[in-house]
């Protein structure tokens, strides 16, 4: 992991200065005049007047003359600021008589396009503002039939004839209105939460560029950003900076699928051309509490879900290494060929971290590919305080890491990292002649598209790269540490209260805090099938009331023979202790009469 020590190159004279203001402080009258020129005439003259109080008569005269000359200029194109202000000034526009055909690239469509997009930006900014306003609901819940039947002014049905831009703007507002504010500080329902403003800016730019990630020739900057970022992520995992490979995929499930494909190709490259009939009876392993995507990949890739063997876990949801080794031996005795195991760093429900070191020892003993699904827990690698929970990850052959989860990058942003260079290319390359010509004028090794199972690939890198530039590694570290501190705060608040019961003993490893709310009617009642049956209904009822009121959202689920319990997860940097307190109080309020 890169050192977070601040650079010592700053001069001693600036040691106590705020770098954010020092670098922005204009040092010449021409610069100040430019600042004044970007303001209204009244404010600009005030800036000039302020400077005149401390400067010579000659300098005063030159500054004011320059300002007045620029203000009186009739040529708007003489200054970028003036040009911008003139072109992007809001005007009264009747959108009821305008249609998509009136926007660019229509002839004379620039003004209509500007006004339409300014309205859209207003809608977005209003949504962003409300997202961070705790007095605003997390959601305005409606049942599916209500939305399908249509709300006032909002109809999901598609029409044969174009609708006005006025209606399109209404549709934009209502789409956000009836959705869920996943960036709200009191949204705790999923592993992916938050609304990072830098990431939002990056996503706007990405959509505007509207390009594809398969070749350098159409996405030169984005392709290089992806390579640089993946290299940095591999280094943080603990691999050599010279080796390795990776690619961004549509999500953790696809990244996990890539890992199985890469492992199969590594051991049995003939499968690419001859199919599964040409290889032995293969089996792979994963924990009984791992993400369901491993079994889904087993079905999709032709192994069959019966050949995805589940390893037992302890009470905290971690793989039991002895059971893993026993199941390898059992499979071999039955004539199967074990080749792959998935260890999880941050399980979906308990937030458990499998013992990677012990699993890696077994993999080396039996020559298995070790994959670590760190989709949820990978962000902890950025934290010097918590990365020890992933000790041994550097021994993995591949790693899934989802920045759109713990790191707060906007959806979607998932990486598959592979220790050995060339396997992804060999596994997936099809050499489509219309895309991947070998005789281009640049180094075609930068045409990364043939490593992917997709052809078209969305640009997921820019928002992540931009956030990393804005926060730095230290910024991500602080963000992740804060979320884990909030989980510890929640655990400490409820662990000894009679109205709450923890699903397992001990502090959480991740931000997952699993608990039951015990209504008054069940407190002090001994454990029995009847009590568990009643308790099983509590979390769904509270969740339904929670969604109806729209005040907060938190997930629930059963696990094994356990009754439904709440699974609290914290990945939103906007959340605070007061939001945790609110959640506890809201659960008590909604569940007190059950």
From Swiss-Prot:
It catalyses: L-glutamate + H(+) = 4-aminobutanoate + CO2. GO terms for molecular function: glutamate decarboxylase activity; identical protein binding; pyridoxal phosphate binding. The modification N6-(pyridoxal phosphate)lysine is found at residue 405. The keyword Lyase applies. GO terms for biological process: chemical synaptic transmission; gamma-aminobutyrate shunt; gamma-aminobutyric acid biosynthetic process; glutamate catabolic process; locomotory exploration behavior; social behavior. GO terms for cellular component: axon terminus; cell cortex; clathrin-sculpted gamma-aminobutyric acid transport vesicle membrane; cytoplasm; GABA-ergic synapse; inhibitory synapse; perinuclear region of cytoplasm; plasma membrane. The modification Phosphoserine is found at residue 78. 4-aminobutanoate binds at residues 190-192, 567. Homodimer. This is Glutamate decarboxylase 1. It comes from Homo sapiens. The gene is GAD1.
């Amino acid at each position: 992991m890169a050192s977070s020590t601040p650079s010592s190159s700053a001069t001693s004279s600036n040691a106590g200065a705020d770098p954010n203001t020092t670098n922005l402080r204009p040092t010449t009258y021409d610069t100040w005049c430019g600042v004044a020129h970007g303001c209204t005439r009244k404010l600009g003259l005030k800036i000039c007047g302020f400077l005149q109080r401390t400067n010579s008569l000659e300098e005063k005269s030159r500054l004011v003359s320059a300002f007045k000359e620029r203000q009186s200029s009739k040529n708007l194109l003489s200054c970028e600021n003036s040009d911008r202000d003139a072109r992007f000034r809001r005007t009264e526009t009747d959108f009821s008589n305008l249609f998509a055909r009136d926007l660019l690239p229509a002839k004379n469509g620039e003004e209509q396009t500007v006004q339409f997009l300014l309205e859209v930006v207003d809608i977005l900014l209003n949504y962003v503002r409300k997202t961070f306003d705790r007095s605003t609901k997390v959601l305005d819940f409606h049942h599916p039939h209500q939305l399908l039947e249509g709300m006032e002014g909002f109809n999901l049905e598609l029409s044969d004839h174009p609708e006005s831009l006025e209606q399109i703007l209404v549709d934009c507002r209502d789409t956000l209105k009836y959705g869920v504010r996943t960036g709200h500080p009191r949204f705790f329902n999923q592993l992916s939460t938050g609304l990072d403003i830098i990431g939002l800016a990056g996503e706007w730019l990405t959509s505007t560029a509207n390009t594809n990630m398969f070749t350098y020739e159409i996405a030169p900057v984005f392709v290089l950003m992806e390579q640089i970022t993946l290299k940095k992520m591999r280094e943080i995992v603990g691999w050599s900076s010279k080796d390795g490979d990776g690619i961004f995929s549509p999500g953790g499930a696809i990244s996990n699928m890539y890992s199985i494909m890469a492992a199969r190709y590594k051991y049995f490259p003939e499968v690419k051309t001859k199919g599964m009939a040409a290889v032995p009876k293969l089996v792979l392993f994963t924990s009984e509490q791992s993400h369901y995507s491993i079994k889904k990949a087993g079905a999709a890739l032709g192994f069959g879900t019966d050949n995805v063997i589940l390893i037992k876990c302890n009470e905290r949801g971690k793989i039991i290494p002895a059971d893993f080794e026993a199941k390898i031996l059992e499979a071999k005795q039955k004539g199967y060929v074990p080749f792959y195991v998935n260890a999880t760093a941050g399980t979906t429900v308990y937030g458990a971290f499998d013992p990677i070191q012990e699993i890696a020892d077994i993999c080396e003993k039996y020559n298995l590919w070790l994959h670590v699904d760190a989709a949820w827990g990978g962000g902890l690698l950025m934290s010097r305080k918590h990365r020890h929970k992933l000790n041994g990850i550097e021994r993995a052959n591949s790693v899934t890491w989802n920045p759109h989860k713990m790191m707060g990058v906007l959806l979607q942003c998932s990486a598959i990292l592979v220790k050995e260079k060339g396997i992804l290319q060999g596994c997936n390359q099809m050499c489509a002649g219309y895309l991947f010509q070998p005789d281009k004028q640049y180094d075609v090794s930068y045409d990364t598209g043939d490593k992917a199972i997709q052809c078209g690939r969305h640009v997921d890198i820019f928002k992540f790269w931009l956030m990393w530039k804005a926060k730095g590694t230290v910024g991500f570290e602080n963000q992740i540490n804060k979320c884990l501190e909030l989980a510890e705060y929640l655990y400490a608040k409820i662990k000894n209260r009679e109205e709450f019961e923890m699903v397992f003993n001990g502090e959480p490893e991740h931000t997952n805090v699993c608990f039951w709310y015990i209504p008054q009617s069940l407190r002090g009642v001994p454990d029995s099938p009847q009590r568990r049956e009643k308790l099983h209904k509590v979390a769904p009822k509270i969740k339904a009331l929670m969604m109806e009121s729209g005040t907060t959202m938190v997930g629930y689920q059963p696990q094994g023979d356990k009754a439904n319990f709440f699974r609290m997860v914290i990945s939103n940097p906007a959340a605070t202790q007061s939001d945790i307190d609110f959640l506890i109080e809201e659960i008590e309020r909604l569940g007190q009469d059950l």
